Structure formats: structure tokens, C-alpha cells
Curated annotation (Swiss-Prot):
Originating species: Cutibacterium acnes (strain DSM 16379 / KPA171202) (Propionibacterium acnes)
UniProt name for this protein: Lipoyl synthase
EC category name: transferase
The Radical SAM core domain, residue ranges: 67-281
Organism lineage: Bacteria, Bacillati, Actinomycetota, Actinomycetes, Propionibacteriales
EC identifiers of the protein: 2.8.1.8
Amino acid sequence: MSVEADGRKLLRVEVKNSQTPIENKPHWIKTRATMGPEYRDMRRRMIDGDLHTVCQEAGCPNIFECWEDREATFLIGGDHCTRRCDFCQIESAKPEGYDKDEPRRVAESVKQMGLRYATVTSVCRDDLEDEGAWLCAETIRQIHQVTPGVGVEMLAQDFSGKQDLLDIVFEARPEVFGHNLETVPRIFKRIRPGFRYDRSLAVLDSAHEAGLITKSNLILGMGETREEISQAMRALHDANTDLLTITQYLRPNSYLHPIDRWVTPQEFDELAEEAREIGFVGVMSGPLVRSSYRAGRLYRQAMEARGERPVMIVTGYRDGAKPAPFAAKE
């Protein structure tokens, strides 16, 4: 190990990663940081509510766009993760105490913001007996209770593949259950040492068996080949995954995995077409797409494919205006 300036010990992989300078982004990756009034209001609400959002912790490039459109993804369980993935800037450390009031506060924030569709994700909590399953389930229940009719997407960890813990989350009935595969088998252990490729596929299949809409994500640019991407997409479809997002890896800092390549917008379009041909009912593919980007649209596509009506959005009125219904088509 080596030591960083602030005294934190660096892992060997972090030292190795840091030898590669941060890469310059191609012109199609760059975004303009426009902090409009809705963004500023959302940021104030996050601070006042003592909430964590994956938008902030993961350095999402869409934060200004999504918050300006009053879309947000909530990170629960704290801001430290018990596992380390080599693409994620959320700090890996022993988390602090268990905040049982967090589900209520998240639900109240969803109501105050007038959100139509909320995505909830969690850090890994291997330090807890239930690995955070109750916290995830209770957050789903609280959002449904406080804002009846709102769509809730749970982007979950794998809970070590323990069926009893997965069932706790499934029984809360999120509109969508997401678990991200992220990469291909050949480099999976290097990128996600705390997870297992086959176990992640089994988690998605289990959610399907529970009657939930399922969703996953693949990150490109970490060393995978084009054929490996196709194989991973087919594996996800074979595991009964309904929805798929395909994204470009953006390296948050020099201690994380170097970028292997920049995938062109044309290749993202080709992958989207291939995914639809494989049989996914909803696909988002692009350099700045993230797993929770336009999540409500993909949910509607899945419901249409099932011949069912999406939930109607009847959440909080804002500035005296009645929220529009969550229509079946964009």
C-alpha cells in the first residue's frame, strides 16, 4: 500500500491506476454545467433534508439536466460502501450507524419535490445482518404510502445472493427492480471484486420470478470487447432482464480504473438496436446515459409490453399546479 496526502492508505490497485493520467474527453462527452433555479432548489432540499443522492456521490454528468427537470435518484444507507468497485467514487469504508428514519425523510422529499418517478439506490451494507434489505424495502413502502401512485425504482445491490434478503425487498413491490451487471465476465473480478457475475444474473432472474419488472446496466470503456458486450446482453436477456441501459465509463478520479476507449455515439446506437433485436423491451444507450436516466420512460415501455397501465402520478402539487398524469406514451 501507499499513503495519500490526507493520510488514507491507498490500495495497490489505486496506486497502479493513478499512474495513468485522467483522460481528455472527446467532444461528444462534454456537457455544459447550467445551474438553473430548479437545480438550485433541488440542491437546497437535499441539504435541508440531510439526504444523499447518487447524482452527487457518483458524479453523474446528467445532474444539472435531471435536477432542472426535477428528477432525482436517492442514495440510502449512508455515503460509505462496504465494497469497492473500480469505477465508483463512493468511498469504501466501514459505514456509520443505521438511520432508521431515512426512509421517511426520503419519502417526504419525494412528496415535497413533486417527483413523478423516484429511483432509490443503496450502498452495500455487509456490516448489517440483513445487508440493508429492510432499509430498501421500508423506503419503497414509505414512498408508496406518502405519495400514493408514484413509481418507485429500486436499484439494489445483490444482498450476497441470499434469497431471504432479496424477498424482503421484492415484497415491498417496487415498480422496477434494478441490479447492475456493469461489465463482462473476463474483467468482472478485476472491476467488481465484491460481486459475482453469475450471482448478479441470478438476482435479476429471481426478481423476474417474483413478478417484478427487471433492469440492468452495462458500462463500456473498461477493457471489454465488442463481442463480449453482445454476450453480456444475451446473458442478461436469458436472465429475464426487461430493461437495459448502456453507458460510457467516465473516470471520476485518478485512483479509479483508467478508461480503455471512448465509445462513439454511432456504436451506442448500434448496440441499442442489437439489444432491441435480442428482445429487451426498453433500451437507453448513449455516452451520457446512466442507469437511472429517464427511468420513467423505460418503466412505461415495460408496462406497455405487458399490456398493463403504468401507475398514475398524483404526487405533491407544486406552486398550486396539478401534476400531469403519468401518460402511457412519451
